[in-house]
Amino acid sequence: MPHYLDTATWARREVFEFFRGFDKPYFNICTSIDVTRLVELLRERGGVSVSMAYHYFALRAANEIVPFRYRLRGGKVFVHDVIHGGTTVLLPNEAFTLAYFDYVEDFATFVGGAGRAIEEARTGDGAFRPRNDDDGRIHFTVLPWISFTSFSHARNWGNEDSIPKIAFGKFARENQQILLPFSVEVHHALMDGLTVGRYLSRLEEMLLEPEVYW
């Protein structure tokens, strides 16, 4: 069940205390993820966008790697049982809004729910309503126009904003591979490069055989 972490006995206690007070305690890692198998299977299958699928796998991996469910609350570390998603949605007038959706392990159920949330955001009143008080999410953004190699996010909540932020870019082709630019930004008081490495390894592992998960 959701609970607060006992930081007094946490192996990272001193690291946590050190980075918690930084003005900018975030670090960002950019890489390229091989989505060749995912794209090929979805072309054969039809009916599901690649974007919807990579949101699912990025969120599933985040739920499996426990520190991605840590959040800072009043200087304490809160641990969510499950974290959900929110993503940017481009509007017809070229402004953007946000869509929020729940994580569900079943692929088809997730795609249905997230797809409805995104469509409702796209066809709604276009109002920009960020849920600043909802930290039980991963913040996603999609830039399908840019194969980026570096990325940083705008932030305005001081050093207590501990929600991981993930960006997806424009596919790039290299030899026979289809590569997805991928950025993950996290709070250093809550995790280190080792944690992000485990997250990326798990994500890559799932994307080698995505059909196992649907």
Role assignments for model-derived ranges:
Residues 1-30, 51, 128, 135-179:
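Flexible, Gly/Pro-enriched loop and linker segments at secondary-structure and domain junctions
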Residues 46, 50-53, 106, 110, ...:
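Short amphipathic alpha-helical segments
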Residues 57, 61-65, 117, 202, ...:
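Generic non-transmembrane alpha-helical segments
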Residues 2-5, 29-37, 44-48, 61:
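Aromatic-residue-lined binding/catalytic grooves and analogous aromatic/hydrophobic interfacial grooves
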Residues 20-41, 82-105, 179-185:
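Acyl/amide activation-and-transfer machinery of modular secondary-metabolite enzymes
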Residues 108, 120, 160-214:
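Active-site-proximal acidic secondary-structure segment that organizes catalysis
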Residues 48-85:
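Hydrophobic "lid/gating" helix adjacent to the active-site nucleophile
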Residues 91-148:
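Helical lid/core segments from catalytic subdomains that handle acyl or acyl-like groups
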